A protein has these predicted regions:
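Outer-membrane beta-barrel porins/channels
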Residues: 1-224
Length: 224
């Protein structure tokens, strides 16, 4: 048996400050245009279009270095690795919304709506497990899923009494995804090819995932 003595400062328990990263996330601008109208008291319609480029997400962090302009030790530095990842995997998203309502009678209204949302992921988007970023260094999980566009269709009716109203709606949300168990891009890298010649340039086929959803909602209300 041999006793080993370590200096008091050999191991330091991490404090809150050691595990805390203050960061700033700037989301992209959104451009939106819409129009709508009514025809007498019987028909109303509306259309809206929106665009947002998620590849322009920008992350920065506080490096606490001396800022000669501000005269202090607190400033924000752009997280280049994370911003490059956003640029390489995300893209502009288009959203279209349309809605129509027809008053069949003074009490009965019929409704129809449609939404389209394009996928924010690029077709060749991949999970990067190692990112030289202050916000995130390693990703322990290997699986990831790229989502497709969304199509949303709704229809319904509403009936109004003097103090009671009733609404019934059906909603269908259509979307799919491609699930990858791991990123196979590294199988073509030089060192991997040399170390694993039998697995060189191996690829994995994604699993198609059905994310369709059907929803029926019913509302009964009373006005006082």
């Amino acid at each position: 048996k041999q006793d080993v003595y370590l200096p008091d400062d050999y191991y330091k328990h991490p404090s809150e400050d050691d595990n805390y990263l203050e960061y700033n996330l700037r989301t992209p601008w959104r451009a939106r245009v819409s129009m709508g109208s009514t025809v007498d008291r019987y028909f109303a319609w509306g259309v809206e279009y929106e665009y947002a480029n998620y590849g322009k997400n920008h992350m920065s962090y506080s490096d606490y270095e001396y800022d000669s302009w501000g005269g202090g030790y607190h400033r924000r530095t752009s997280d280049k690795a994370m911003n490059d990842l956003n640029k390489n995997t995300l893209r502009g998203q288009h959203t279209v919304k349309m809605g129509f309502e027809f008053n069949a009678t003074d009490n009965l209204a019929l409704r129809l709506g449609y939404n389209y949302v394009s996928s924010m992921f690029k077709n060749d988007a991949r999970l990067t497990q190692h990112i030289d970023s202050y916000a995130m260094d390693y990703v322990s999980g290997t699986g990831y899923m790229n989502l497709s566009d969304v199509n949303l269709i709704t229809c319904g009716l509403g009936y109004r009494f003097k103090k009671v109203y009733f609404d019934l709606a059906y909603r269908f949300r259509q979307q799919s995804g491609k699930y990858y168990a791991f990123d196979d891009s590294f199988t073509g890298e030089g060192q991997f090819v040399l170390d694993n010649p039998n697995l060189a340039y191996a690829t994995i086929n994604p699993v198609d995932v059905n994310l369709n959803r059907h929803t029926i909602t019913c509302t009964l209300g009373v006005k006082f």
